[in-house]
Amino acid sequence: MSDALANFLESRMPMDGMAAWCLRNPDGSASHKSFTVWLSPTQIEQTAARLALAADSLQYQELHPAQVCWIFSHLRLYLALRPDGSSLTLFVENRPNHPHEQTRALLEEFIAV
């Protein structure tokens, strides 16, 4: 992970409701952090890899997502893709009245770093 991205993530975490994050580098290597006991490192890395693959496969349909959000009963999974091929997946608790705009703003900042 580059120093700029490491500093970016460390200065903004943990956010309210953040269960985990995973940063995937263009070479496929990953860094992650969990703020809960119910997400294992393997779950975090494999989920982030699958989501990045799903978003990447949309490119073949001429769809170019910058951010994607999957909503499940207990989690929202946010994915941001950077032009350099790196991605950030955020695992956020799916709480009522949670300020999800804050999460989207973080992803926009990640893309711009």
Question: Which residue stretches match the model-derived regions?
Answer:
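Non-catalytic interaction/Regulatory regions outside core domains
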Residues: 1-25, 29-113
